[in-house]
């Protein structure tokens, strides 16, 4: 994309493959710097205004490609550190992407459900099932769940699509 140099620059401090950031950007906005979602997310990396404020990104810079990518990289780095309990880097990437899309606390709720049910809370294959279940009352009303309902199918699909596009951008065939 025309933003690859920015992905290369801002992915380095967080030790991400720049092609993964590019794949995420495609999923977020199809590389449209003026994109705005129905929920109010803005710019290339679809940053919510409240998140932008927490990241030190002024609202007048939300649609600036470099500022938006730089802020998204800071946010991804923060999420990565919040999942330091997941030692496998490949697994951790799934949780970071899921949190970027669906919210950190919702993903932690799904992890708590997985743990309670004897599943591996550090494996996306196990936790993604609970992300999906957080759209059903039996699960989002469970006392262990602190943040309630989430549209889990969107988040699970988001992670899968980015991983697939990343493989494509990296020239990888098959695998995970």
Where do the protein language model's features map onto the residues?
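Catalytic glycan-binding domains that act on GlcNAc-containing polysaccharides
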Residues: 1-176
């Amino acid at each position: 994309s025309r933003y690859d140099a920015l992905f290369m620059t801002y992915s380095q401090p967080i030790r991400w493959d720049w092609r993964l950031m590019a794949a995420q950007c495609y999923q977020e906005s199809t590389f449209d710097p003026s994109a705005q979602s129905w929920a109010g997310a803005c710019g290339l990396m679809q940053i919510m205004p409240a998140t932008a404020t927490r990241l030190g990104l002024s609202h007048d810079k939300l649609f600036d490609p470099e500022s938006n990518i730089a802020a998204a990289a800071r946010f991804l780095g923060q999420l990565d550190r919040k999942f330091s309990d997941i030692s496998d880097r490949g697994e951790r990437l799934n949780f970071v992407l899921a949190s970027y899309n669906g919210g950190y606390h919702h993903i932690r709720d799904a992890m708590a459900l997985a743990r309670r049910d004897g599943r591996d809370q550090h494996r996306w294959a196990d936790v993604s099932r609970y992300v999906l279940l957080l759209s059903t009352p039996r699960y989002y009303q469970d006392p262990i769940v602190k943040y309630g309902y989430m549209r889990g199918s969107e988040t699970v699909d988001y992670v899968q699509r980015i991983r697939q596009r990343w493989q494509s951008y990296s020239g990888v065939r098959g695998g995970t």
